[in-house]
From Swiss-Prot:
Belongs to the FKBP-type PPIase family. Tig subfamily. One of its GO terms (molecular function) is ribosome binding. It is found in: Cytoplasm. It comes from Shewanella sp. (strain ANA-3). Its EC number is 5.2.1.8. Its main location: cytoplasm. It comes from the Bacteria. Keywords: Cell cycle, Cell division, Chaperone, Cytoplasm, Isomerase, Rotamase. GO terms for cellular component: cytoplasm. Residues 160-245 form the PPIase FKBP-type domain. PANTHER family: TRIGGER FACTOR CHAPERONE AND PEPTIDYL-PROLYL CIS/TRANS ISOMERASE, TRIGGER FACTOR-LIKE PROTEIN TIG, CHLOROPLASTIC. Consists of 3 domains; the N-terminus binds the ribosome, the middle domain has PPIase activity, while the C-terminus has intrinsic chaperone activity on its own. It catalyses: [protein]-peptidylproline (omega=180) = [protein]-peptidylproline (omega=0). This is Trigger factor.
Length: 434
């Protein structure tokens, strides 16, 4: 086998590989003979079909298969010999056979050489937060509101009330599509409607008819309404006030607490809040570390890896539409290219961190991650057992553990400052509610 390597552009490499033509001819001959022994063709006894007949019927397909196998095998031998690390599947272009040699070209991309830089320039503001008694009480108040019952009242509508109404919206005196509803129910203070709509209902009673003026946000989804001033003619049909359940053992029973009553509920709430806080704190620090790592390391990315990641993201997006992807048009790659490139770059950089620091997934950390995740389920032990019996899930958890270890390794050289933050403020920002 003779091999020449050409760097074409960027990460692309072109291998020209020559192998003795007799190598292919022998493999084709052997394959034809094997096929002749097992072929069943009318007019010939089993195992007695002439090779010339087999060659006429199947020769072209057999030669094509053999050629593909020869190219694949010799390509692998060539990249090992040349110490090349392909980042995607090669494209093979077979050449002509001159009787003595068979030549083909393999084109592919290689992984970039990654040299980590600026690790000591990464700046991280590490938030410190804890769950207080007041935070637990606030969560209980939220749960009370979620389990409230509503009854009609004869007073002005206030924040937290539910109201029922009929309304018609118009812009410049003309009704617009989607701007009309009957028997519409809305909880005031929920933020479901455009700014000013809910505020315009406050202070009105059931039976009143009134008009409110609002302006659609510039980022509103309907193009024809962006930034437009509108009027809504409203007929308020009912005002319903919330009746919150008392905080007692009966309230605790609503959440499956069969023993321990209210104290047991508070313990369970605190445990869940602590778990969510720990996850959010880790995610916050990780995002800062990753952002710093990306900013300080500019590397060339193999297009093959980006294309593969685009396909993954596209498939995930299609599944979010309900999994019915058969009759849906394919989403354009441009929607996912930027995110895909970022994910590829993160993977390459973290891979180098793992390699440089000789990191291996710690079994204790893997089991701790599984236990933390399982604690959110009714029967944690069953979830833990399921994960430990599933090779694919276990590999996913090892990857998560390795990522954590890589982030911790980067933190050792980063500029880290700690900042005390309140639980509610931090979690609101983490979940996008701030």
């Amino acid at each position: 086998m003779q091999v020449s390597v050409e760097a074409t552009q960027g990460l692309e490499r072109r291998l020209t590989i020559s192998v003795p033509a007799e190598q292919i001819e022998k493999l084709v001959k052997d394959s034809l003979q094997r096929e002749a022994k097992r072929a069943r063709i009318p007019g010939f006894r089993p195992g007695k079909v002439p090779v010339t007949v087999i060659n006429k019927r199947y020769g072209a397909a057999i030669r094509q298969d053999i050629t593909g196998e020869v190219m694949q095998r010799n390509f692998i031998e060539a990249i090992i010999a040349e110490k090349l690390n392909p980042a995607g599947a090669p494209t093979f272009v077979p050449g002509a056979t001159d009787g003595e040699k068979f030549e083909f070209v393999a084109t592919f991309e290689i992984y970039p050489e990654v040299e980590l830089k600026g690790l000591d320039a990464i700046e991280v503001e590490q938030p410190k937060a804890s769950v207080t008694d007041a935070d637990v009480d606030s969560m209980i108040e939220t749960l009370r509101k979620q389990h409230a019952t509503f009854a009609a009242v004869e007073r002005e509508a206030a924040d937290g009330d539910k109201v029922k109404m009929n309304f018609v919206g118009s812009v410049d005196g003309v009704e617009f599509e989607g701007g009309k509803a009957d028997d519409f129910e809305l909880q005031l203070g929920s933020g479901r409607m455009i700014p000013g709509f809910e505020a315009g209902i406050l202070g009105h009673k059931a039976g009143e008819e009134f008009v409110i003026d609002v302006t659609f946000p510039e980022e509103y989804h309907a193009e024809n309404l962006k930034g437009k001033a509108a009027k809504f003619a409203i007929t308020l049909t009912e005002v319903l006030a919330a009746n919150l359940p008392e905080v007692n053992d009966e309230f605790a029973a609503l959440f499956g607490i069969s023993e321990g009553g209210l104290d047991a509920l508070k313990t369970e709430i605190r445990k869940n809040m602590n778990r969510e806080l720990e996850q959010a704190l880790k995610a916050n620090v990780k995002e800062q570390v990753i952002t710093g790592l990306l900013a300080n390391n500019d590397i060339e990315l193999p297009k093959a890896l980006i294309d593969g990641e685009v396909n993954v993201l596209r498939q995930q997006a299609m599944q979010r539409f309900g999994g019915q992807t058969a009759n849906m048009p394919e989403l354009p790659a441009e929607l996912f290219t930027e995110q895909a490139a970022r994910r590829v770059k993160i993977g390459l950089l973290l891979g180098e961190v793992i390699k440089t620091n000789e990191l291996k997934a710690e079994d204790e950390r893997v089991q701790a991650l599984i236990a933390s995740m399982a604690s959110a389920y009714e029967d944690p032990s069953e979830v833990v057992a399921y994960y430990n019996s599933n090779k694919e899930l276990m590999q996913n958890m090892r990857n998560v553990a390795l990522e954590e270890q890589a982030v911790e390794a980067l933190l050792k050289s980063a500029k880290v400052t700690e900042k005390e933050v309140a639980f509610e403020e931090f979690m609101n920002k983490a979940t996008g509610r701030a």
